[in-house]
């Protein structure tokens, strides 16, 4: 009897762990979640970060506080792995400097990130936010961040 009770207890514990891990992802996206944005550096407007991003060193060579800048592959892997984000098709495809910024987002987590690509194969994260919904016009995220 003790062995059966022990198995039931372990099964119950495993089930509660799985459920507790799934709950944040389920609760992260709400249709009424307001869109909010934060610059990569507190107190620095996002449009200023976008301008500076083209000349910042990659993060492992940075001397002080700055946005996360790294090889494109590293940025992409970080956004995919840590935040379940992927590029949003059609966002940032115009010709102005602000419009070359890439929008990455996650339906699962409800998060989004603005990435400033550079000609040397590196990129900088200039802003991030919450409230992503694939049904919204992508311009909402750029506008909320202070671009466009």
Predicted regions and their residues:
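Polybasic/polar functional segments that serve as interface/processing modules
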Residues: 2-111, 115-148
